Amino acid sequence: MKTIILAGGLGSRMREETEYKPKPMVEIGGKPILWHILMNYNFYKQKEFIVCMGYKKESIIQYFLDFNSLDQDISINLNKENEINFVDTKKELNDVKVILSDTGLESNTGERIRQVKKHFSKGETFMMTYGDGLSDVNIQELINFHESHEGIGTFTATKPESRFGVIETDENNLVTSFDEKGRIENRINCGFMVLDYDVFDYIEENDNFEQQTLKKVASDKKLYAFNHDGYFQPMDTYREYKNLNSLWDKNKAPWKIWND
């Protein structure tokens, strides 16, 4: 099953890191967040990806062109027109196929998905997620849930951590508990979607996929939510970037479900 990764946004709230590269190329533990997402899907035997590029697309293209030459020794035979051999073949992602598609600098999310329709056959089911969110969601259980209902779309729904402290008080307004972080009670769409080919019928030119396309699918009663109570964290701010790197450096990254 192919997976679309939306990787074309500007990342304007993380200008410290995204001035010269797109947000999916911002590194966590020395690896782009895009790599972490690929590793998660690969853990569940998902091997085909379509990366929808836009802002600073050259950075993504160059990363994949150079992928096999990163982090390993290279042997170059200068007598044979610079014949190149990689001394240590990477074990990670070595059987993965990635299509890099330029979907425009200012395209909305729905438009980016619409532009890669050509890479799918009629009737094909596929997945989609965002290039800046990490989770330990069980991809196989997500697929199984999608196949269990008659809708054409499933998104993963989670209760995110509040950015504010959460307090509880008694009848006299005495504070009885104070948590630095609490969870918002309403669930949100965190990506990690499974979509049927018919969803393309709902995408109009330059649609916002979340605010327009999915609303139309939901109004036709064809959209379902897969509840996820585990870890999810977007990288929307510099503070979140620092926190994700701190978790990785301490070997406490909840999204790292694969083995080294």
Which stretches of residues belong to each language-model region?
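Structural beta-sheet core signal
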Residues: 3-5, 51, 128, 153-156, ...
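Conserved beta-loop-beta/alpha segment of the NTase-like Rossmann-fold superfamily
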Residues: 59-170
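A structural signal for short hydrophobic beta-strand segments in well-ordered beta-sheet cores
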Residues: 25, 166-169, 214, 225
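Well-ordered alpha-helical segments embedded in enzymatic catalytic cores
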Residues: 33-36, 112-115, 213
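Short coil/turn segments at beta-strand junctions that form active-site/ligand-binding loops
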Residues: 1, 47, 122-125, 221
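N-terminal glycine-rich phosphate-binding loop and ensuing alpha1 helix
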Residues: 1-69, 100
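Catalytic-core segments of class I nucleotidyltransferases/pyrophosphorylases
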Residues: 124-127, 134-135, 139-147, 158-162, ...
